């Protein structure tokens, strides 16, 4: 048995020999008598290194265990790193493009709409910057959206140039022609009922007699009699004002099929008698000139000089609209004050309003 006395620096060895004596070894004895100290901690790892034997000193005090000091230092360092990482203040402003060593900083591949960052901190050596929490999300415009105001303005301009393309003033009509009546005269009489222009779209029925214009330049006509099925009927009649007399200009063309399969057609030059009830589809619209005449003309604003006016109180808010409409008229600056004073419509009326 060996006893280590720290106060005196002496080691006592008990031997169980024949004499049963006790040998006392002092600190200045040879190294064969020294024994390594035992650690008091019971949970040491089996791979721990045994510290070297204590060196003799003047005070004969043993140094603290080396293993315990190492474990304490490692634990303290880890704790300090955790505290410094948790209390690190997040920097604001634009992130750096280059790192301290001059290398380009890699951006985070995460999108802006990703989930919040995890609770654990990245390793100190990584240079990954996350913009999900620092930058604001910008408004994303849908791909199928467009400027409706600009589109509406373009349509209005197109209507001024070609009103028929917009289709807002186009009205369809159906004309029924009884047996024995002239289809041409029926359409012309319908077009004379108003100032609108007429276009013939289609027709169906049977014709008993038709007069067509010859295609040559002689100006002759051809008349066909029998039963002919209407294949197509088209034309237009436009209003015309010449010398104060309102008239119609235009014409129609027709294609007919005979019972034996022959097809005849051309420009109508006379009667188109119906052999059965005939339905004609026409459309009425305003021509380009009529459309521009009926549009309200915009008043051109002339520049005028006017003296500054005083502020108008709330009690005379009703009179403010009258003064504003009169002041916007292009009148002379010299007679502006006189016209306002002489006009009885511009008299101010005192209105008392109790505001609670």
UniProtKB/Swiss-Prot annotation:
Motif Nuclear localization signal, residue range(s) on this chain: 295-302
UniProt keyword terms in alphabetical order: Chromosome, DNA-binding, Nucleus, Transcription, Transcription regulation
Pfam families, per database record: PCC (PF03479)
Bias kind Low complexity: ranges: 106-118
UniProt DNA-binding region: 89-101
Extent of motif Bipartite nuclear localization signal: 89-97
PROSITE patterns: PPC (PS51742)
Record's comment describing the protein's domains: The PPC domain mediates interactions between AHL proteins.
Protein name per Swiss-Prot or TrEMBL: AT-hook motif nuclear-localized protein 1
Originating species: Arabidopsis thaliana
Gene: AHL1
């Amino acid at each position: 048995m060996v006893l280590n006395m720290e106060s005196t620096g002496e080691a006592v060895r008990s031997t169980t020999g024949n004499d049963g004596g006790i040998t006392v070894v002092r600190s200045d004895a040879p190294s064969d008598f020294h024994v390594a100290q035992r650690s008091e901690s019971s949970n040491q790892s089996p791979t721990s290194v045994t510290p070297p034997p204590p060196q003799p000193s003047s005070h004969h005090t043993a140094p603290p265990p080396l293993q315990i000091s190492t474990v304490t230092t490692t634990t303290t360092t880890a704790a300090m790193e955790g505290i410094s990482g948790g209390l690190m203040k997040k920097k604001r402003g634009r992130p750096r493009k280059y790192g301290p060593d001059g290398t380009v900083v890699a951006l985070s591949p995460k999108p802006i709409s990703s989930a919040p960052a995890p609770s654990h901190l990245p390793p100190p050596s990584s240079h990954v910057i996350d913009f999900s929490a620092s930058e604001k999300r910008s408004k994303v415009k849908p791909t199928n959206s467009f400027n409706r105001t600009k589109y509406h303005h373009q349509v209005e301009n197109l209507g001024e140039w070609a009103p028929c393309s917009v289709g807002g003033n186009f009205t369809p009509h159906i004309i029924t022609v009884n047996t024995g009546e002239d289809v041409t005269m029926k359409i012309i009489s319908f077009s004379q009922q108003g100032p609108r222009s007429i276009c013939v779209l289609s027709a169906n029925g049977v014709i008993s007699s038709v007069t067509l214009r010859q295609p040559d330049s002689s100006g002759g006509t051809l008349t066909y009699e029998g039963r002919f099925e209407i294949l197509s009927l088209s034309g237009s009649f436009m209003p015309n004002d010449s010398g104060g007399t309102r008239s119609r200009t235009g014409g129609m063309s027709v294609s007919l099929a005979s019972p034996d399969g022959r097809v005849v057609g051309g420009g109508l030059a006379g009667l188109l008698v119906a052999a059965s009830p005939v339905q004609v589809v026409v459309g009425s619209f305003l021509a380009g000139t009529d459309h521009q005449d009926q549009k309200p003309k915009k008043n051109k604003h002339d520049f005028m000089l006017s003296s500054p006016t005083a502020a108008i109180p709330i009690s005379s808010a009703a009179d403010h609209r009258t003064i504003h409409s009169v002041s916007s008229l292009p009148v002379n600056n010299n007679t502006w004050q006189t016209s306002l004073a002489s006009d009885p419509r511009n008299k101010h009326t005192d209105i008392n309003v109790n505001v609670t």
